[in-house]
Amino acid sequence: MRLVSTVLDGPDVRALAEFYRDLLGWSYRPGDEPPPPGEPDPRGEDWLVLRGPQGRQLAFQQVPGLTPSTWPDQSVPQQLHLDFAVATVEELQAEHDHALRLGATVRLDRTDDPDEPLWVFADPAGHPFCIFVAPEQA
């Protein structure tokens, strides 16, 4: 058995997929690309898949009315989070700026940690994700 995809629920599947496509530079699964402006988007109303290196997939499932996580406050706990590694502190800062431009919000700043500098963000649907320095994993 093997893990095929990590799936994120969200109230706007297309917007969430576009956020991660821009953040990671991944591509849509054939047929999941956005339609031309003004055209209907039936694929973006339910389920979309992004594909990355080595066959990795990140999928998005429409869940109307999803309540975003409030982590680190536990009133609406996270169910999962994504970890992304970069090789240097300079890359960490560049990815921080990139994530904010795309609509992420900062949840935690631990960039002063000498062993593992990191940022914790929330994506536009409220899912927490981390970007941290780990040269051996980047």
Task: Show which residues each predicted segment covers.
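Short alpha-helix boundary/capping motifs
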Residues: 10-11, 89, 116
